[in-house]
């Protein structure tokens, strides 16, 4: 598993992978942070694809994930997942965050994609404490990879160095890197 999980500091929209995961809001129509950056980089075709998903199924609840084309991104697809808003930890946030990662990985597997890049879901405007969120992310991905051949490569793409170091520390403790 060591060679399957990677940490990168930088811009997730520039990474050449099969799938980029978007930390979306329930509307799927773009927003701030990584969601806005992905929508801007992908161009209007991504927004149109998200509008179609909304018409078919309505809003995307926390913990769920949907897949669309990638527009102008250097990826084949975008998985939009909605993480939980942090409300103190007593409102099922940890399970919802785990579900966001797991359901995204299920879509990667179901579509036969080999590589995926995750942002630090829910740690921006949604206020999830970074150490707890990173631990859930690393554990959920490691557990999934232990059971499945795909994806072959998972990237945690961190906007800042501090978060990248946090993920690297967790992976080292787990013996994955």
UniProtKB/Swiss-Prot annotation:
Q: Which GO terms describe its molecular function?
A: O-acetyl-ADP-ribose deacetylase activity; purine nucleoside binding; ribonuclease inhibitor activity
Q: Which InterPro entries match?
A: Macro_dom (IPR002589), Macro_dom-like (IPR043472), O-Ac-ADP-ribose_deAcase (IPR024900)
Q: What is its EC number?
A: 3.1.1.106
Uppermost EC category: hydrolase
Question: In which domain of life is the source organism classified?
Answer: Bacteria
Signal peptide (residue range): none
The catalysed reaction is: 3''-O-acetyl-ADP-D-ribose + H2O = ADP-D-ribose + acetate + H(+); 2''-O-acetyl-ADP-D-ribose + H2O = ADP-D-ribose + acetate + H(+)
**Which ranges carry the Macro domain?**
1-175
Q: Does the keyword Kinase apply?
A: no
Where's the active site on this chain?
A: 35 (proton acceptor)
Entry binding sites for substrate: 11-12, 25, 33-35, 122-126
Query: What are the alphabetically sorted keywords of the record?
Result: Hydrolase
Any GO BP annotation: purine nucleoside metabolic process
A Pfam family:
Macro
- What family does this chain come from, according to its entry? Belongs to the MacroD-type family. YmdB subfamily.
What is the annotated role of this protein in its UniProt record?
A: Deacetylates O-acetyl-ADP ribose to yield ADP-ribose and free acetate. Down-regulates ribonuclease 3 (RNase III) activity. Acts by interacting directly with the region of the ribonuclease that is required for dimerization/activation.
Quaternary structure (record): Homodimer. Interacts with RNase III.
Name this protein carries in UniProt: O-acetyl-ADP-ribose deacetylase
| Species this chain originates from | Citrobacter koseri (strain ATCC BAA-895 / CDC 4225-83 / SGSC4696)
What gene is this protein translated from? ymdB
């Amino acid at each position: 598993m060591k060679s399957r999980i990677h940490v990168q500091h930088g811009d997730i929209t520039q990474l050449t992978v099969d799938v980029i995961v978007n930390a979306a809001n329930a509307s799927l129509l773009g927003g701030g942070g990584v969601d806005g950056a992905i929508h801007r980089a992908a161009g209007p075709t991504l927004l149109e694809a998200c509008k179609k998903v909304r018409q078919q199924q309505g809003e995307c609840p926390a913990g769920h994930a949907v897949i669309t084309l990638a527009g102008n991104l250097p990826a084949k697809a975008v998985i939009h997942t909605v993480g939980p808003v942090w409300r103190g930890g007593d409102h099922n946030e940890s399970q919802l965050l785990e579900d966001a990662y797991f359901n995204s990985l299920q879509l990667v597997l179901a579509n036969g994609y080999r590589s995926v890049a995750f942002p630090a879901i829910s740690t921006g405007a949604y206020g999830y404490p970074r150490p707890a969120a990173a631990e859930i992310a690393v554990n959920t991905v490691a557990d999934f990879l232990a059971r499945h051949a795909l994806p072959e490569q998972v990237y945690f793409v961190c906007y800042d160095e501090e978060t990248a170091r946090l993920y690297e520390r967790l992976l080292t403790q787990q013996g994955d890197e």
